[in-house]
């Protein structure tokens, strides 16, 4: 919606300052934004004679700015007053017009702003403090979703501590600015000067932090505790903000201490105050839980026990970078036995990435869900175990919306599907990440418990966010304990008791199933377009099924498995025999005349595919069929593995069928099912071209007459067509 007075301001700025050094023209949209605020700021600096105008209201601007106040009648308009009135309009305060003169209505607008900011002095004089706050996008009126009592806190902080914090927003939303302002207020009460106070709860602030008890007369400290309690959740409402440490404050402090698993004294001591204002809280406090990327030996497990730890978080998969290179951080059955034998409990963490926004792309949640559940089942974690999926970066709120929420939606969908398998453990979903991510995934119904990355106190996702209600573990300090072979680096974790961790495991014992699963994984990993789908072959996989594992308007991929591994008929032109991982023929011999349509690199690619498939099969047979229909060209690979080694001279069998269904486009005449199929595939170029590509069409053209007449097709020719079709699709 266009604001006429904002539009007039934008037009005046461009008319007055365009072409002047340091001024950047603003968009004349009638909408307030940083573009307009920066334009007003640069205009002010030009009027102040600053040689190099900039977007920020910095020290030089503050030093040169002189207060503006009501003028005498018949005063001449000035650019300074135009800038002031434009800033007031952008802020939502009505100065009575855009006149360039500072009369009663402009003065009243300034007074209204001073009142909205919580200032005691409401004299209508525009000081540096006022002008700097006006030239900013912060809101000073209660916004949608805001809390009037949070706004009262913000106004009170502006009233009492503006020499430390300037003027902070008064929008009713608890966030980073309010959190830092509370720390500045604490630092002033502790006696720090404006040159020392920094809004960070460091060692100096910690050492000066008071212990407040019922009846404490230090009103400033008590008010800060009252504010902080309310900002951490309405469950900790202390009552009126009156600076009195009464029954309401005692009750709220005890409730907060209980929630954070701190000693429930009712006294606002340093650990309590620091927990109210900083995500990590008192990092010297004891903890009964920890997490580590280090593989735990018997000596390290004893170190954990000796230091009071009862529960430890370990990674299901992955590596960690050390000075000597990449080292596995993955939990093993052997290590798990050591941990449990030491009387420790375990909570599993999944992190094979997640350090930056680019990791969280479509289908990543599905892949991670299957990988995590497969690893957990293989290790024997029982139903009810919560797996914590890591989001290990400071995601902005829009990234949580656009990337993190969809990621966990995919995980939940995959877990729901896995739970339909009768043999699958029923795992719960947890999240590791900053507070905002934990809160939002929980509120969306996507996670049961939160493992909160509170150690990162400077994360925007921690500053100004309360502790999630479903927190299970609270990561707050990194260090090393023990010595010699018992030395181990850990993160100390607060423990709420919501997730007790696993105290026993029951690994599945089915070597035949595992052997088949390994073979299927190996086969999928060798075929282009399927290497990213190997997560389907996980410990929840059910054999003797048929499933479409990829679908699009142009291509479907269908996977079928059978526990019967019948040996194909000898002499079939579609069959290659594989012995000890080697194919019974070379690609050039199989291609025959078809190879004239291919480049040397393409022929090498097909040979490599054939070799890789042969290695995954070890001993068995490979068949390829090409079946054209009115709707699609179907290329089917059948892999027979009749002698999969299990152990102790025991073998098992498996037949894997992968069908690539390359679809035709609408508008192509379709032969009725009753009539003889007589498609002229070479004439389909215009329809297949976007999917299959030129090279594949050449091959299909070479095969056309054989296909139409239902003759056999050489296996290598079919493989070539399949490869080119897939490559063309995935690179188009």
From Swiss-Prot:
GO terms for cellular component: plasma membrane. Its main location: membrane. InterPro entries: Glycoside_hydrolase_SF, Peptidoglycan-bd-like, PGBD-like_sf, PGBDSf, Rv2525c-like_Glyco_Hydro-like, Ybfg_C. CDD domains: GH25_BacA-like. Keywords: Cell membrane, Membrane, Transmembrane, Transmembrane helix. It is found in: Cell membrane. Belongs to the FadG family. This is Uncharacterized protein YbfG.
